[in-house]
Design a protein with these regions (language model features):
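Acidic, Ser/Thr/Pro-rich intrinsically disordered cytosolic tails and loops
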Residues: 1-432
Length: 432
């Protein structure tokens, strides 16, 4: 120590300690400020995100309330004041339905054309009726012909044959067609021209449409006609704005909170992202896009009431002649609602006479449900009461309207896909 020369004396140690203390204090102040900003950011995201979640949930509840029928109609026995295609759309607003809306709309519209005598539908391929004028044929005679020939009985389950009747070609204005029915008939007439005959089955339709480059335009024409027809009812209004915007903002705040904190605090990041994502997913899954207007409440009441009445048809003891007269239209709207198979069973429970082929040939040959029940004579089913679910609800066509609903739906889906595939790539397909 004696060998070290002291150059200058002073309080350098105290100064160094003071400097280090100041630096430490600045660091602590910076950390405190950073923590305060982080907490403030959490609070801002939490408050704004929570507010958006509350607004989104309120919007979802409100949209669901507006999409609910609040009137007093429990059962409705007459045709609704809307076309079958519009009924297929409207029932989706207020109730759960089986099958795609576009498919149900097409099927119900075709059946409406059958009721209005613009079309006729027969089981089996068109070749099975070669030499027969189906525009004048009696359904009972055709049923007896099929029953007497096992090969025809077998072929009857393979497809359906459509017949464009003469009045649809020459006196269409007398049929009282709606916009959607007119567009559907025009589509079928165009297809029949490509087939080369007013009598054609789905296999022929598919083959004829496989190279129809402009076919998507006719399909779009039908889809647009359905949309315009429904818009003109003024039955619904858009209520999605009540929940879509706050739902998106809530999810955005959740993502921001997660990204900001994922590197420093995984628990907080998951709380933000997970909670807001769950709320957003819930709102996206349960929010309704369309709510009923005042007139929409009336139309919805009629559709829901008719659906309930048809589903409970066999429970009513006061059925009368009106129900039999209306049954053709019941089957049309059953297809629009996606309940054809159930309604066919209900009618069979209420009127066991349909199990008797002779009774059907005498009194039911001109009804839309004739082939539903008559086909069981050649399919080995003598009664309806013990029918399996597959007989009405399966994909196989057995000559019945209950099954023809599925068959027409499947057939037109296939034809639509064929038309879309034939469309030029720039057209974007049929959309229908």
């Amino acid at each position: 120590a004696s060998g070290v020369e002291r150059v200058r004396s002073g309080d350098y140690l105290d100064e160094l300690k003071s400097t280090e203390a100041n630096k430490e204090q600045q660091w602590r102040d910076g950390q405190r400020h950073k923590a305060q900003l982080t907490v403030a950011g959490w609070l801002v995201c939490l408050i704004l995100g929570g507010l958006c979640c509350v607004l989104a949930i309120r919007g979802v509840v409100s949209s669901n309330r507006e999409a609910t029928y609040h009137g007093g109609i429990e059962y409705w026995r007459e045709s609704p004041q809307v076309s079958p295609a519009s009924a297929a759309h409207l029932i989706d607003v207020v109730d759960d339905s089986k099958g795609e809306q576009s498919s149900r709309a097409m099927t119900a519209t075709v059946l409406a054309l059958v009721v209005k005598k613009a079309l006729a539908v027969y089981p089996g391929p068109a070749d099975m009726y070669r030499g027969i004028d189906l525009s004048r044929a009696n359904a009972a005679d055709m049923a007896r012909m099929i029953s007497s020939d096992p090969s025809r009985a077998s072929a009857a389950s393979s497809t359906s044959t459509l017949v464009i009747l003469p009045q649809a070609l020459s006196h269409r204005e007398t049929l009282g067609l709606s916009r959607s029915e007119e567009a559907c008939l025009q589509l079928l007439i165009r297809i029949s021209a490509r087939v080369g005959s007013p009598v054609f089955d789905f296999n022929q339709m598919k083959e004829a449409c496989s190279s129809w480059e402009n076919g998507y335009q006719e399909m779009n024409h039908f889809t647009n006609a359905c949309d315009i027809e429904f818009l003109q009812l003024n039955a619904v209004r858009d209520v999605s704005g009540r929940w879509i915007a706050p739902t998106i903002f809530a999810m955005v705040f959740g993502v921001i909170g997660m990204l900001v904190n994922i590197g420093s605090n995984i628990a907080v990041a998951l709380c933000f992202g997970g909670a807001f994502a769950c709320v957003g997913t819930f709102c996206l899954a349960t929010g309704r896009k369309e709510g009923l207007t005042e007139s929409g409440q009336t139309y919805a009441g009629e559709c829901l009431g008719l659906k309930r009445y048809m589903e409970d048809f066999s429970n009513f003891s006061d059925r009368g002649a009106l129900d039999l007269v209306m049954w053709n239209w019941y089957m049309v709207y059953a297809a629009a609602f996606g309940i054809s198979d159930k309604v066919a069973r209900e009618f069979a429970k209420a009127y066991p006479e349909v199990n008797d082929p002779q009774w059907l040939d005498a009194y039911g040959y001109d009804s839309l449900g004739y082939w539903t029940y008559r086909s069981h004579a050649w399919n080995g089913m003598s009664t309806m009461g013990g029918m399996s679910t597959g007989a009405f609800g399966g994909s196989q066509f057995m000559g019945g309207i209950g099954d023809i609903g599925s068959q027409l739906s499947s057939g037109f889906d296939s034809v639509s896909s064929t038309i879309s595939a034939a469309a030029p790539s720039s057209s974007g397909g049929s959309g229908g």
